[in-house]
């Protein structure tokens, strides 16, 4: 494939990168045009930011123009943002932007296996795992719902990091008393479980998510409300630790001494957590009655859902629309508009089938330019063309009212872009649905449509109509194939790098 590289003209504020000729060589350089994106070394915790002001016109409403404001204000009282691929789509950025127009932002499932990256108005990067992405907006209350599994040391570390950067959490973060506690030992046995699976490993984040949900399902888990009863907490924790030791010989339970130490630790945690603990079911339903606007922030994505994802290479919770009701305790009839977030190409971290995966120069380029390394593990993400079959399947399950197409700017270097539009079986017949059979999925052939690239920097554009014709054709072809309108388009990491269609 013939691709064109960029001439770099930005002044980096924080970066470990250098602009070298390597990128031009890799991309088969044959022309010049300007762009502010840098080729960066693998370091997912560092982001290059330009000190130059954007070329976009100044707009009101915190960077949202009139068209965007109309889109946002039309969203229903209870709306949601969910992943439409395999995670890492950019949900946090959309939630951060929408949160300014909502009273409450709520997490309904998952745990610290989420990694949502957002930026404040000064361009400072925040990586959130448990705290909802609405936290940077002072008027927003952030709810951690009953469906979330909460690792208290991680939560407090996150809160401390926010506080040290001037972001107050006092009175703004509510933790469900029904949420289950994720302990350090859950993380340890998560790793032991992966070691047991050997070559069949799932590729978890080793954050203890699966073991904690397992404790919940077999009904010996410990909930946040149990911290109010430390007289029985010790007995419950002893049962959990004993079960882990019986199941995993390599897990060393130190008996009474270890138990006593852990109980004392959680007594301190309980005292600190108490101001945050709330009956969030009562709180959210009360807010609905008071006509407050609520935005639900999904974590992971549909293709990682425990039921509808590429099982067993999935997460341990319901990351589709149905998880909103079970994870927050609200009725299905109150859930309104859902926005699916779709990256302009496809990525996946960890194991599992990947029909449109790209190997070689193009895949390496997308990984490097897009900083495609897992927010949790730092593992390089696998990259591929946009899989229309999978996206259509996700839209069918969730009933998305609209989509957010993120990272469109990352395709600006490509002279040709492919869309995976059809799955074909080995015998040549068309597969009309996304298969549950992974063996079948690994052997399907993908039929592609090839679209022209636009080979120009779009990161400073702020009106959809100003996009190059080829970029608009790419967006509109996705809409045609999927059958869901794209209302939001991400064209860079910054808060204002958004287009409204």
Curated annotation (Swiss-Prot):
Belongs to the adenylosuccinate synthetase family. GO terms for molecular function: adenylosuccinate synthase activity; GTP binding; magnesium ion binding. CDD domains: AdSS. Its EC number is 6.3.4.4. Plays an important role in the de novo pathway and in the salvage pathway of purine nucleotide biosynthesis. Catalyzes the first committed step in the biosynthesis of AMP from IMP. It is an enzyme of class 6 (ligase). It comes from Capsicum frutescens (Cayenne pepper). Pathway: Purine metabolism; AMP biosynthesis via de novo pathway; AMP from IMP: step 1/2. The keyword Ubl conjugation does not apply. Keywords: Chloroplast, GTP-binding, Ligase, Magnesium, Metal-binding, Nucleotide-binding, Plastid, Purine biosynthesis. This is Adenylosuccinate synthetase 2, chloroplastic. Mg(2+) binds at residues 88, 115. Signal peptide: none annotated. Its cofactor is Mg(2+). GO terms for cellular component: chloroplast. The active site is at residues 88, 116. IMP binds at residues 88-91, 113-116, 205, 219, 300, 315, 379. Substrate binds at residues 375-381. One of its GO terms (biological process) is IMP metabolic process. It is found in: Plastid, Chloroplast. SMART domains: Adenylsucc_synt. GTP binds at residues 87-93, 115-117, 381, 407-409, 490-492. It catalyses: IMP + L-aspartate + GTP = N(6)-(1,2-dicarboxyethyl)-AMP + GDP + phosphate + 2 H(+). Homodimer. This protein may be expected to contain an N-terminal transit peptide but none has been predicted. Binds 1 Mg(2+) ion per subunit. InterPro entries: Adenylosuccin_syn_Lys_AS, Adenylosuccinate_synth_dom1, Adenylosuccinate_synth_dom2, Adenylosuccinate_synth_dom3, Adenylosuccinate_synthetase, P-loop_NTPase.
């Amino acid at each position: 494939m013939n691709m064109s590289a960029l001439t770099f003209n930005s002044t980096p504020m924080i970066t470990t990168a250098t602009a070298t000729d390597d990128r031009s060589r890799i991309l088969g350089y044959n022309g010049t045009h300007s762009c502010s994106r840098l080729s960066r070394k693998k370091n997912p915790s560092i982001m290059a930011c330009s000190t130059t002001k954007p070329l976009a016109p100044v707009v009101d409403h915190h960077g949202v123009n009139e068209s965007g404001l109309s889109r946002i204000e039309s969203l229903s009282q209870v709306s949601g943002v969910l992943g439409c691929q395999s995670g890492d789509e950019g949900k946090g950025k959309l939630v951060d932007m929408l949160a300014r127009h909502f009273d409450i932002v709520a997490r309904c499932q998952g745990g610290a296996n989420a990694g949502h990256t957002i930026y404040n108005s000064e361009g400072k990067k925040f990586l959130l795992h448990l705290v909802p992405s609405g936290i940077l907006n002072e008027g927003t209350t952030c709810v951690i719902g009953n469906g979330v599994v909460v690792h208290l040391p991680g939560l407090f570390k996150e809160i401390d990091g926010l506080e040290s950067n001037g972001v107050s959490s006092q009175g703004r973060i509510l933790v469900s008393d029904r949420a289950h506690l994720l302990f350090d030992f859950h993380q340890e046995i998560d790793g032991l479980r992966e070691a047991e699976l050997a070559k069949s490993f799932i590729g978890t984040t080793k954050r203890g998510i699966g073991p904690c949900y397992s404790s919940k399902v077999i009904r010996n888990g410990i909930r946040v409300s149990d911290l109010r009863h430390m007289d029985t907490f010790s007995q419950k924790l002893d049962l959990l630790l004993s079960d882990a030791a019986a199941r995993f010989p390599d897990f060393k339970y130190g008996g009474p001494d270890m138990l006593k130490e852990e109980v004392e630790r959680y007594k301190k945690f309980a005292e600190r957590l108490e101001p945050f603990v709330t009956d969030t079911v009562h709180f959210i339903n009360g807010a609905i009655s008071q006509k407050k606007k609520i935005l639900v922030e999904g974590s992971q994505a549909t293709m990682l859902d425990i039921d509808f994802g590429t099982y067993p290479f999935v997460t341990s919770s319901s990351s589709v629309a149905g998880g909103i009701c079970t994870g927050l305790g609200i009725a299905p009839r109150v859930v309104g508009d859902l926005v699916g977030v779709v990256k302009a190409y496809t990525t996946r971290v960890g194991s599992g089938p990947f029909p449109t995966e790209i190997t070689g120069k193009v895949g390496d380029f997308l990984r490097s330019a897009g900083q495609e390394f897992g927010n949790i593990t730092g593992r390089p993400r696998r990259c591929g063309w946009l899989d229309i079959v999978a996206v259509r399947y996700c839209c069918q399950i969730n009933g998305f009212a609209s989509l957010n197409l993120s990272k469109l700017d990352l395709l600006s270097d490509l002279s040709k872009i492919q869309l995976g539009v059809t799955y074909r079986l080995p015998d040549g017949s068309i597969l009309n649905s996304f298969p549950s059979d992974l063996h079948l999925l690994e052997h399907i052939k993908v039929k592609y449509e090839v679209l022209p690239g636009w080979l120009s920097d779009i990161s400073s554009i702020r009106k959809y109509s100003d996009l190059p014709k080829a970029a608009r054709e790419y967006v509109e072809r996705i809409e045609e194939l999927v059958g869901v309108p794209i209302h939001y388009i991400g064209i860079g990491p910054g808060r204002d790098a958004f287009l409204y269609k």
